[in-house]
From Swiss-Prot:
PANTHER family: ATP SYNTHASE DELTA/EPSILON CHAIN, ATP SYNTHASE EPSILON CHAIN, CHLOROPLASTIC. GO terms for cellular component: plasma membrane; proton-transporting ATP synthase complex. GO terms for molecular function: ATP binding; proton-transporting ATP synthase activity, rotational mechanism. Belongs to the ATPase epsilon chain family. Keywords: ATP synthesis, Cell membrane, CF(1), Hydrogen ion transport, Ion transport, Membrane, Transport. Signal peptide: none annotated. SUPFAM superfamilies: Epsilon subunit of F1F0-ATP synthase C-terminal domain, Epsilon subunit of F1F0-ATP synthase N-terminal domain. Produces ATP from ADP in the presence of a proton gradient across the membrane. It is found in: Cell membrane. It comes from the Bacteria. InterPro entries: ATP_F1_dsu/esu_C_sf, ATP_synth_F1_dsu/esu, ATP_synth_F1_dsu/esu_N, ATP_synth_F1_esu_C, ATPsynth_dsu/esu_N. F-type ATPases have 2 components, CF(1) - the catalytic core - and CF(0) - the membrane proton channel. CF(1) has five subunits: alpha(3), beta(3), gamma(1), delta(1), epsilon(1). CF(0) has three main subunits: a, b and c. This is ATP synthase epsilon chain.
């Protein structure tokens, strides 16, 4: 079966460079599946899991937004952060989730609600991928 070269890069450097048969990401317009030969496109990505399929194996990455560039035989994901399931510290993600929930429940005026909501989404995404 044909494959795509997939590169996932963060400001800290490359996270993954490998070949896969299919890439599934959550773009701003909804979930998108990429197969070899896909038309070129650039799309912003949401905080979500990226599914990378090769044969019967599926690898998951937790990404915190970014962009995806698609060429017929290559997918490049430029993300603010990206972690493989094995790299996620589940305990730390649970603590981040609890902290964000407490901030959102607090009735203080000085809370940046948008920032707390994004932190909660990132923590939930990391927990989902890390399990």
């Amino acid at each position: 079966m044909r494959t795509l070269e997939v590169s996932v890069v963060t400001p800290g450097g490359p996270v993954l460079e490998e070949s896969f048969e299919m890439v599934v990401c959550k773009a701003e317009t909804g979930e998108i599946g990429i197969l070899p030969g896909h038309i070129p496109l650039v799309s912003p990505l949401q905080i979500s899991a990226v599914r990378l399929k090769k044969g019967n194996d599926t690898k998951y990455l937790a990404i915190s937004g970014g962009f995806m560039e698609v060429q017929p035989e290559k997918v490049t994901i430029l993300a603010q952060s990206a972690e493989t399931a094995s790299d996620i510290n589940v305990q730390r993600a649970k603590e981040a989730k609890d902290r964000a929930e407490r901030r959102l429940q607090a009735k203080k005026d000085n809370i940046d609600k948008t920032r707390a909501e994004l932190a909660l989404k990132r923590a939930i995404n990391r927990l989902d991928v890390g399990k």
